[in-house]
A protein has these predicted regions:
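Sec-dependent N-terminal signal peptides
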Residues: 4-13
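Boundary of Sec targeting at the N-terminus
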Residues: 18-20
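The feature marks the first
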Residues: 24-38
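Amphipathic regulatory helices of Ca2+-sensor modules
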Residues: 28, 42-51, 66-79, 113-122, ...
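Acidic carboxylate motifs that coordinate Ca2+ or other divalent cations, activating on Asp/Glu
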Residues: 33-37, 57-61, 104-108, 128-132
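Blade-edge motifs of beta-propeller repeat domains
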Residues: 39-41, 85-90, 110-112
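Beta-propeller blade repeat segments, especially FG-GAP/WD-type strand-to-loop junctions
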Residues: 54, 86, 125-131
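Intrinsically disordered, low-complexity Ser/Thr-rich linker and spacer segments
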Residues: 71-102
């Protein structure tokens, strides 16, 4: 059951890039805000990201092999396509913070837990557009609004 819940959290990653129907970022906060206070902290993002790694590390060797990462990429892509997301932000999309080329620091085609987790602070900073130390739906409102 926990793997199902974590997989749902993973495939909801695309939702953080744009609004689903309603308030931009609301679904991201719903899935990543572990204490329910309406804001995602770096600690919460780190914990959830570790959960995501565990979900896709099928053989539990602390490495996402190319095949395991392919499954992760496919889950994210399917969610983004199903929700009409991923257009308009290009390489600057916060969703890109989990791409293999971002997380595979040594370029060997596999992503270790350390590589995946060491990318969290930069990814989180990209989400926290107002630099207040938390990610809220306000961080997803298009600039100029």
């Amino acid at each position: 059951m926990i793997r199902i819940a974590l997989t749902v959290a993973v495939i909801s990653l695309g939702v953080m890039a744009q609004a689903q129907q309603g308030q931009p970022g609301a679904h991201f906060v719903e899935m990543w805000d572990l204490d329910g206070d309406g804001a995602v902290t770096l600690a919460e993002a780190t914990e959830r990201r570790g959960d995501i790694f565990t979900t896709f590390d099928e053989n539990e060797d602390d490495i996402l092999s190319a095949g395991e990462h392919d499954l992760f990429d496919e889950a994210r892509a399917a969610d983004m396509q199903a929700n009409g997301l991923g257009r308009g932000q290009g390489r600057n999309s916060p969703a890109n913070g989990m791409l293999r080329e971002v997380t595979d620091a040594d370029g060997d085609g596999a992503v270790s837990r350390d590589e995946f987790m060491s990318a969290v602070p930069g990814w989180f900073a990209g989400l926290d557009r107002d630099s207040d130390g938390v990610v809220t739906p306000a961080d997803f409102v298009p600039r100029g609004n």
